[in-house]
């Protein structure tokens, strides 16, 4: 029997728009046509380093606030950085960003932090 892969989805939504995006992401990740993937969903304020260490892949969702990621996502990244450093090298991740413009500020700020964890962005 093939071991299931683990996908962790972490997001933050204050107004509900990123939550609506996350619902679509979660629906896609849990599609019955996709086999062998176990999905866990966590709010950014509740997600932990243990959740990240469990995962084989990570999806992060954030609104862009003032050209930056949400404070809750930054807080999540601050909490998991050192416990996960050197333990998740090469883990694939992707972002979904809800923004009134192109979301570049949030994407750049998250990408800069995640480069330090040596995980690999996929598109």
Predicted regions and their residues:
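Helix-loop-strand module that forms the ligand-binding subsite of alpha/beta enzymes
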Residues: 44-121
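Residues at the starts of beta-strands that form the adenosine-phosphate
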Residues: 6, 38, 92
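Generic alpha-helical hydrophobic packing signal
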Residues: 23-26, 42, 55
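N-terminal beta1-alpha1 ligand-phosphate binding loop
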Residues: 2-32
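Short hydrophobic segments within beta-strands
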Residues: 10-12, 42, 96
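A short beta-strand-loop structural module common to alpha/beta enzyme folds
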Residues: 35-46
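Short, well-ordered coil/turn elements that cap or connect secondary structure elements
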Residues: 2, 34-36, 88, 116
């Amino acid at each position: 029997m093939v071991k299931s892969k683990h996908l962790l989805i972490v997001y933050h939504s204050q107004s509900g728009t990123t939550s609506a995006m996350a619902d679509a992401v979660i629906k896609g990740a849990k599609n019955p046509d996709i086999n062998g993937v176990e999905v866990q969903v966590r709010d950014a304020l509740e997600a932990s380093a243990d959740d990240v260490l469990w995962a084989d892949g990570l999806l992060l969702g954030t609104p862009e606030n003032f050209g930056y990621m949400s404070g809750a996502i930054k807080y999540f990244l601050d909490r998991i950085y050192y416990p996960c450093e050197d333990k998740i090298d090469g883990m694939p991740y992707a972002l979904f960003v809800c923004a009134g413009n192109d979301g570049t500020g949030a994407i750049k700020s998250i990408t800069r932090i995640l480069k330090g964890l040596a995980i690999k962005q996929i598109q």
